[in-house]
Amino acid sequence: MQLKNPILGLCQQATFMLSAAKVDQCPDDEGFEVAFAGRSNAGKSSALNTLTHASLARTSKTPGRTQLLNFFGLDEDRRLVDLPGYGYAKVPIPLKLHWQRHLEAYLGSRESLKGLILMMDIRHPMTDFDLLMLDWAIASHMPMHILLTKADKLTYGAAKNTLLKVQAEIRKGWGDAVSIQLFSAPKRMGLEEAYTVLAGWMELEDKAPAE
């Protein structure tokens, strides 16, 4: 299937910009930024790599490898940000606390941050970390879109049932401000829907000529 979303070309030319250990090392706070967050082993790096058609984000058999804010440029004004993964038991507590402080500082200060993509493993959705991110997004009036990753690990019927269940739980606890979809990196499931969300947040219009 040929995807025609206007964000597709930009994602395909994404390039690594820099890694930041703290907010004052981030790029200039201007333009459009979309951040990707998720508990360790939720498939965040794989999702980013699939969306950009590249191996930009580091994947590892050891969850929790992303320890920095990693910025990827789409053009002069637009960026994707890979946030630190959380929850892996082998990461020392002091390092976890360090990540948490700098994540909170980033989320609370970036004027250019236009939306947050939250990855949830469809087999283990709505973890404590996910609930914290949902609470923060609603309190901060930050648009959030959830990818239920690894949807290929379930049958389509089971995946759809989980989607509806999580959707209902989110609507009950947080209202209609959060959108959600199924996603699979290896099967390339849900790409068009995710691209549409990114294009909207980054204020891209479909410039395809009328037929």
Curated annotation (Swiss-Prot):
<feature type="binding site">
    <location>
        <begin position="82"/>
        <end position="85"/>
    </location>
    <ligand>
        <name>GTP</name>
    </ligand>
</feature>
<dbReference type="InterPro" id="IPR030393">
    <property type="entry name" value="G_ENGB_dom"/>
</dbReference>
<dbReference type="GO" id="GO:0005829">
    <property type="term" value="C:cytosol"/>
</dbReference>
<keyword id="KW-0460">Magnesium</keyword>
<feature type="binding site">
    <location>
        <position position="45"/>
    </location>
    <ligand>
        <name>Mg(2+)</name>
    </ligand>
</feature>
<dbReference type="InterPro" id="IPR006073">
    <property type="entry name" value="GTP-bd"/>
</dbReference>
<dbReference type="GO" id="GO:0005525">
    <property type="term" value="F:GTP binding"/>
</dbReference>
<dbReference type="Pfam" id="PF01926">
    <property type="entry name" value="MMR_HSR1"/>
</dbReference>
<dbReference type="InterPro" id="IPR019987">
    <property type="entry name" value="GTP-bd_ribosome_bio_YsxC"/>
</dbReference>
<feature type="binding site">
    <location>
        <begin position="149"/>
        <end position="152"/>
    </location>
    <ligand>
        <name>GTP</name>
    </ligand>
</feature>
<feature type="domain" description="EngB-type G">
    <location>
        <begin position="30"/>
        <end position="204"/>
    </location>
</feature>
<dbReference type="InterPro" id="IPR027417">
    <property type="entry name" value="P-loop_NTPase"/>
</dbReference>
<keyword id="KW-0717">Septation</keyword>
<comment type="function">
    <text>Necessary for normal cell division and for the maintenance of normal septation.</text>
</comment>
<protein>
    <recommendedName>
        <fullName>Probable GTP-binding protein EngB</fullName>
    </recommendedName>
</protein>
<keyword id="KW-0131">Cell cycle</keyword>
<feature type="binding site">
    <location>
        <begin position="38"/>
        <end position="45"/>
    </location>
    <ligand>
        <name>GTP</name>
    </ligand>
</feature>
<dbReference type="GO" id="GO:0000917">
    <property type="term" value="P:division septum assembly"/>
</dbReference>
<feature type="binding site">
    <location>
        <begin position="64"/>
        <end position="68"/>
    </location>
    <ligand>
        <name>GTP</name>
    </ligand>
</feature>
<feature type="binding site">
    <location>
        <begin position="182"/>
        <end position="185"/>
    </location>
    <ligand>
        <name>GTP</name>
    </ligand>
</feature>
<keyword id="KW-0132">Cell division</keyword>
<keyword id="KW-0342">GTP-binding</keyword>
<comment type="similarity">
    <text>Belongs to the TRAFAC class TrmE-Era-EngA-EngB-Septin-like GTPase superfamily. EngB GTPase family.</text>
</comment>
<feature type="binding site">
    <location>
        <position position="66"/>
    </location>
    <ligand>
        <name>Mg(2+)</name>
    </ligand>
</feature>
<dbReference type="GO" id="GO:0046872">
    <property type="term" value="F:metal ion binding"/>
</dbReference>
<keyword id="KW-0479">Metal-binding</keyword>
<keyword id="KW-0547">Nucleotide-binding</keyword>
